[in-house]
Amino acid sequence: MSETSSSRPPRDLSQLRTELASKDTEIVKLLADRMRLIRDVAEYKAEKGLPSFDREREGELLDVLLQRAHDRGLPGDVVRDVFTALFEASRLDQRRFLQTRADKYKIGIIGGTAGMGAFMANVFRQSGFEVEAMGLDFGRSAEEVAASNEIVILSVPIASTVEVARRVGPKLRPGACLMDITSIKRAPLAAMIESTSEEVEVVGTHPMFGPHGIDFDRQKVVLCRGRGDLWYARIKKLYEAFGAEVVEATAEEHDLQMAVIQVLVHEKTMVLGSVLERLKADLARSLQFASPIYRTELAMIGRMFSQHAELYADILTANDDATRLSSLFEQEAGHFARAVAMHDRAAVVKRFQQVAEYMKEFASWARKQSDAILVELVRRG
């Protein structure tokens, strides 16, 4: 009969600690070997012009590792945390290497003293780029900045972008690049192209994130072609060197997607916040009852209403595709409101099932993503 763990005599604690220390040392050696391989990967990517971040590969690798952990009886959350930290360290090492190899351009940021413009100025400066930022009460004039830099970035409110582009566009020198970081693309791109000479290239960009973090790690940036190919390729490579995942699109597709991604989502959040305000709901008390989903939703509502009203007003009103989608939103909200008012359970079930059928191929990914978000929220309290 085999000896069970309960009947086995206890081992000496100092011996156990010695063995643990030995295993920890082995782990450190493995980590050092892994980081050396990461540097080799970075050198290869620099030579081939590849981005530092590959979302699909990273996700597939983590799934494989989690399955192997499960097969060995290891807790998935611990393994996920360990490899998430390792992947983050690996990406940072790759980005730093790629940034040292990147061509250093003179960058002028119009509107570079606050918000996203200030964030980008800081990111580029820390990697050795010469950056000139100007704001309403700081620095040289926008025209002077435009005339003396290789890359000129427009980081101004949506409502001002077209006017600023028309004002500074004629000042750019031949061979330079004018780009924006606005959340609509058709009107800004048209204004940048119309206001600049044929010798100036134009690129439309839209970082799909806010001014936080140390750079663009794992963040998406949409690129839209304006005029020319040279600077388009350079800007794409530059974003990728700082860890961004670049999505290429036409200005028309970008604006239609933003009507869904930004207008619909932000309008929904505004409506929810407005309802809570009309109810004068006790938010602190509601959190004592809250499910993780409600806590997430309330956090997003609070986040939006802690920012500038003008930004969201511009997002909702400047996109030419917004009116049609907002009308559809109103129709669907009205459909459910009528069903609730009439206690029409069948109508709710019918529409729910129609949407579920539309989303069935998307459901597996959605459950996986939302589960990860909710688990992390519960862990963090």
Model-based region annotation:
Residues 108-112:
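Conserved N-terminal Rossmann-fold NAD(P)-binding element of oxidoreductases
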Residues 219, 254-283, 287-306:
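Active-site-proximal catalytic alpha-helix in oxidoreductases
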Residues 115-116:
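Hydrophobic/small residue at the entry helix of a nucleotide-binding pocket
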Residues 287-362:
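Interdomain hinge/lid region at the active-site interface
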Residues 143-195:
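Rossmann-fold NAD(P) dinucleotide-binding segment
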Residues 185, 192-245, 249-251, 255-258:
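Rossmann-fold dinucleotide-binding core
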Residues 2-105, 122, 126:
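Extended, charge-rich alpha-helical interface modules
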